[in-house]
Amino acid sequence: MTQVRETVSFKAGDVILYPGVPGPRDRAYRVLEGLVRLEAVDEEGNALTLRLVRPGGFFGEEALFGQERIYFAEAATDVRLEPLPENPDPELLKDLAQHLSQGLAEAYRRIERLATQRLKNRMAAALLELSETPLAHEEEGKVVLKATHDELAAAVGCVRETVTKVIGELAREGYIRSG
């Protein structure tokens, strides 16, 4: 007999989890479809994208260990999620541990990129990364990415106005088209 999994869905832009706020949705999730953005926001409202969670990935795992959350989890696209049980089985825990290990390696790479690379290089890397997510699609042989300048600023650790300037430079140099 096949076990039926509980799933929940959110529309693009919906906040799934809030920092430090326990509630009925304060659970760990596996992404089945779509893309979830994890963002930290400072007192001035500046956001930093900590991680993009793709299908098969997990987020909210601190709920399994009673830890406070420091980020918002937002549906970057329409998403379908599987809430994890409070007491996951060993196979699920193994998948979660592997995901956490990969997430830690990704975090190290992002920290290294933020600390050592010029903004234009960080922007190019972010655009390439986003081009491989559900935020992008192919149209007439070209990758079309749907992302705001605010979202790009959060991805590379700068303000929107700077993103606008760098996007303009990349467009003038012929690397991208913006519009």
PLM feature spans:
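Hydrophobic residues at beta-strand termini and immediately following loops
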Residues: 8-10, 50-53, 84
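Long cytosolic regulatory regions associated with cyclic-nucleotide signaling
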Residues: 62, 77, 122-124, 162, ...
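A short hydrophobic beta-strand segment most commonly corresponding to one strand
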Residues: 77-86
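Cyclic nucleotide-binding regulatory domains
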Residues: 14-78
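Short proline/glycine- and basic residue-enriched helix-capping loop/turn segments at helix->loop/beta transitions
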Residues: 1-14
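Phosphate-/nucleic-acid-contacting segments
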Residues: 132-179
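Short amphipathic alpha-helical elements of helix-turn-helix/winged-helix folds
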Residues: 126-130
